[in-house]
Structure formats: C-alpha cells, structure tokens
Amino acid sequence: MYLDQIKSELVEAQDVLNKFISDENNIKLIQEAALLISNSFKQGGKVLSCGNGGSHCDAMHFAEELTGRYRENRPGYPAIAISDASHLSCVSNDFGYEYVFSRYVEAVGQKGDVLFGLSTSGNSKNILNAIEAAKTKGMKVIAMTGKDGGKMAGLADVEIRVPHFRYADRIQEIHIKVIHILMMLIEFEMAKQA
C-alpha cells in the first residue's frame, strides 16, 4: 500500500545525508564545534541551546545529553536548554516571542559560554536576537541551519548548514545526527582532562 512511499522517503533521507557528507568542510565544522564546546567546558563555561518547534526539541535533547549522558558514564556537563515555560510565557507576553531566547542569554550568559542555536530556515528572529545577545556578552555561537543559512549565515563562530531546500524534516534529521556526533566528540575530548 505505502511501500513505495516509504522507500522513497528513506532514499531521499539517504541522499541528503550523502550530500552533506560529501562536503569535507561539514566534517571539519563538526570537529570545530565539538572543540569549541569542550574548550568552553574546560574553562568553566556552559552551553545555552535554543530552537523553535522540532529544533527546540533538538536543543533540549542536546542539553539533556550534555547534563545526563550520551554513551559514556562521566560527569555531567553544564548545559541549559532555554525551555522554561514560565520564562517563555513571561517574555512572550511582556516583550514578544522574538525575545524569548535573547532575554535568557542576557540574564545568564557569560563570556566564554556557548550559544547553540538551531533554525532550519536560518531566519528565526528569536534565534537571531539570541545570537546578537550572545555576541554582546562575549559568548561563542554555534548555529545549525539549513537551506542557504538564511539571515543567520555568517553570524556564528561555527555554522553547520544542511543545504536542503525542500522540507525542514530532512534538515532536522541531519541536525540530530550532527548532535550525536558532537556528543561523542565532546565525551572523547573531555575524557582527556579526567
């Protein structure tokens, strides 16, 4: 009944992944992002992560695996997903949804911390505002984007972009793969310090 559609979806996902892998720069950027986060942790910094919708879930997933665990039993790493419901509703109501992440960065971000922002379009105003706030605070910025990077293109210290122009879900599939690789590399790098 749906066998052809199922296979077609899997083939398209594989094609997007293969295209991403074929650009050697993407591999280098993943390593650069992992080292940037690890160095922040080693110097007492933390990660603040944010996104909208499915990307918000990915931001929470990333923070959870930093504070909890990925594959290895090890100390928790300092990470916060900007997902507190009372903060989000307060700022949305009082200032506007475009400030929900930047207000949090202004409140708890410090020089040497890392903002990890996800936007499949690269155009999310609240992520753009968070990037601006992070830079003002002297933080480093890692952006995970899609398509052509949108307005976020060129704003981050490290941008990992999935150049897919059809649906956001394909971009998110690569984002979660990258998040898992980042976790693995961060655990490797932090184990050197233990």
UniProtKB/Swiss-Prot annotation:
Note how many cofactor molecules are bound and how: Binds 1 zinc ion per subunit.
Q: Which PROSITE patterns match?
A: SIS
Q: Where is the SIS domain?
A: 37-194
Q: Where in the cell is the protein located?
A: Cytoplasm
On whether Cell membrane is a keyword of this UniProt record, the answer is no
Tell me the residue numbers annotated for binding Zn(2+): 61, 65, 172, 180
Pathway the protein acts in: Carbohydrate biosynthesis; D-glycero-D-manno-heptose 7-phosphate biosynthesis; D-glycero-alpha-D-manno-heptose 7-phosphate and D-glycero-beta-D-manno-heptose 7-phosphate from sedoheptulose 7-phosphate: step 1/1; Bacterial outer membrane biogenesis; LOS core biosynthesis
State the disulfide connectivity. none
> Can the keyword Cell cycle be found in this entry's annotation?
no
Q: Which reaction does it catalyse?
A: 2 D-sedoheptulose 7-phosphate = D-glycero-alpha-D-manno-heptose 7-phosphate + D-glycero-beta-D-manno-heptose 7-phosphate
**Where substrate is bound, by residue?**
52-54, 65, 93-94, 119-121, 124, 172
SUPFAM superfamilies in UniProt: SIS domain (SSF53697)
Protein EC? 5.3.1.28
Q: Which GO terms describe its cellular component?
A: cytosol
Describe the task this protein carries out: Catalyzes the isomerization of sedoheptulose 7-phosphate in D-glycero-D-manno-heptose 7-phosphate.
Kindly give any further remark recorded in the entry: The reaction produces a racemic mixture of D-glycero-alpha-D-manno-heptose 7-phosphate and D-glycero-beta-D-manno-heptose 7-phosphate.
Assembly and oligomerization: Homotetramer.
Q: In which family does this protein belong, per the annotation?
A: Belongs to the SIS family. GmhA subfamily.
Q: What is this protein called?
A: Phosphoheptose isomerase
Q: Gene encoding this chain? A: gmhA
